[in-house]
Swiss-Prot record:
Residues 115-138 have a biased composition (Polar residues). InterPro entries: C19orf44-like, DUF4614. The keyword Phosphoprotein applies. The modification Phosphoserine is found at residues 112, 205. This is Uncharacterized protein C19orf44 homolog. It comes from the Eukaryota. It holds the Pfam family DUF4614. Keywords: Phosphoprotein. Residues 108-138, 217-236, 305-329 are annotated as: Disordered.
Amino acid sequence: MASTRRPFGPPHGAFDFRDMFFDSSKMEEIRNVQARSLGQMAPGQSRILKRNQTMDEKYLLPKEEALAGTGVRLSLRPPTISSKSRASEALRKLAQIETKILKRRQVPTAWSGMESDSTASERSLPQRTDTTSVSSQYPLRTFQKQVCKTSVVGDDGQSGKGSRFLKKKELPAEARSPVLAAETEKQVLLPTQREPARKYDAPDSDEEEMKVLLGSLMESSGEKERNGNQELPGTRSDLGKVFLDLTPDQPGVLCLLSADQSSLKSTSVSLRAQSLQTRSGGDPASLTTSPSILRDDFSRSASSKRECIKLASSPSRMETESSEEPVSEAAADSLHDFRINILSIDDLVLADGYKSDGEQKGVTTVVEDEEDLTTEHEISEHPGASSTAAVWSHSMSSARSMETPTALSVSPVYSEDFEQFSGPLALEESLDRTLDTLSKFSSGEQTDTVSRQPLSRTEWGRGVTRVVKETAVQTLDPAFAYQWTKAGGMAAIGPTLGGGYVDPVPIASHIISADAIEALTAYSPAVLALNDMLKQQLSLTQQFIEASHHLHHSLLRSLDEDSFHYHTLEEAKEYIRCHRPAPLTMEAALQEVRKELEVHLDINDSHVEASKAAALPAEPIDGL
């Protein structure tokens, strides 16, 4: 049955790239080859499906453009295979990739210091994949457990079973690179389905060749590490160039590669400690003599984890997360430890849009360099500790470094909560290095804002001393709360106003008294006029109150002195009876009339006599 999906359709999950770069005919052809290979295998033989060399080179190998900057070609895996089968498949593909790369391009020798990581991870893959479900819930605890186990176990897991490796052409150690190791680890992390396990009867020539190869690689890696990791700066710069040269069409691929590479390198630390203990005859003290090995591994592991978180915010992540088919539970468990600290697209998107892919890759290189330096300082502080204590401390620092870039991408405000520096020396040196590096990327304003804000906040917090006052005492003090000294008549202003308003030793203190200075400075004509008006108003109010009290007391006093209050009805009748006149009779009336007539008659007689006298002539006066 041919698949009807488009060859470049959206993948089904964050790490599911099964149908990218393959059309329906290629998918059908690969399934047929797998079916034929499965039918030819016996029950006791290897569980790995054998494909012909032409199909592997045509579809399952990355092209030359993987290092030239044209993108990474993803390989196709069967739908679901068990964890041990994924480890064996990864080792087989690693050999094929190395064969292809060696024919076309010679990798520089500067990468040889990092070859032991990818080689040592091959030996730890069977043990690592067996505990996938446990590591998904407790990734830090599982890593520590693996470090403790690998110092005791050794190569017993490979000798007890049959060959899990296919016969292949091996290459010298100088031809390996961390990019190829990342490709191999990516194949292990792809979602697969489980098949019934098949055990091997006896070891064959493939296993013997693999043991010889791993032994030679471990010896070459030990010689390189004893040189003091002098080529580490050049290696870091070359690694940044490889990631910057990749095409921006596949940011999701970069995130996957960086995440796989970080897991591979963190696992290889335990095997490197195992190889050192084997060569030193089982002496644990030999592990403490080479702290540079652990420093190199953990610095690159921390930087790879930051690259994964930075690149996870690219726009292609949205297309990757859109799924049409459910992902199996085994795939979710194996990838849980990589998704635990990666936020969603909504949390990582900035306010004014996505950042360009070039800016994201530039920030990836900057954060990688910064965290490498910080991790190296942290590791160099404890060179004399035992192997278990050193692995525990560096595992904790790696876990903290996994959380720090997430906080920087989401919100710079919470960056102080995720402080990871172990001492003041590492803090100052990492701040200076980060400021110098960020000055080169001043063209991207958003990139500088995301990377520079937490640093400026940290420096500001160290140099500024805050003076906090309660709300109740933040008001102004009274303006005229003076305190005068009584010794010698000196006028001095107390601590209320301080010495900022007048000279602490007034020049007029010997001439003008303290009362005069207080009168001149504390009062003004307006204050005097207001005081006079208030005094007059107060006196008027007092007079009004006194008059009111006087009227009230006078009224009460007059009411108390008067004994008469009111008359009753009986008293009124008695008064009328006593003062009533006597009744008038006829005789009394006639007598009153006669009296009146007599009076009138007398008046008339007087008038008559007067008229008569007036009528007589006047007599002459003698002597005239």
